[in-house]
Amino acid sequence: MSVERARKIKLLLFDVDGVLTDGTIWLFPAPAGVQLSTQQHARQHGGEGGFGFVSQSMMEAKGFHAHDGTAISLARLAGIKTGLITKRISETVALRARDLKLDHAYQGIQDKLTVFEEILRKEGLRPEQAAYVGDDVIDLPVMRNCGLSVAVANARAEVKDEAHYVTEHRGGDGALRDAVEYIVKAQGKWEEVVREYTRERSPAR
């Protein structure tokens, strides 16, 4: 039963694209002086820059939902460590991870299971004490080896089929908040955590 699994969770890990975001990736031309201009790249590559030519001339941006940011704070108050594991590399994600004070942030990862096992060793935890939130097939190896596997509402069918819990909201629209609420409520800490969260932001006068 997924509620029983949720009661054991001490670590919550998640993907970024499609989980913290809706999966959309915005690309913008890099500011002048930051990288070589598109024209310079084109000249260097004889007009055939390919994927490298484009990626070196662009900057990546992502959008995040405020509810998911609050979820990280709520998880922390419940004594749950948090972290992200993502295939892409983005300064935007690095900034968001620092802003949210995540315990773990791994980017550029193809083999997510190896990183998952590394984090478990660092934290001194067992697989059944970790939850993972994913949306696509690259997340399945971790989801198959963690205690509570969570799929966002718009995850691929293969991912939903193997999840212990499917969120009400879509990726980038509060899905991580759903996962945190589910876990913290299963542990009987929700009301206490909400009180502590509001107390921190509205101290008694």
For the regions a protein language model found, what residue spans apply to each?
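Substrate-recognition element of Asp-dependent hydrolases with the DxDx(T/V) motif
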Residues: 70-96, 107, 143
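Short beta->alpha linker loops
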Residues: 88-89, 97, 110-111, 154, ...
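Short, electropositive alpha-helical surface patch
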Residues: 92-111, 202-205
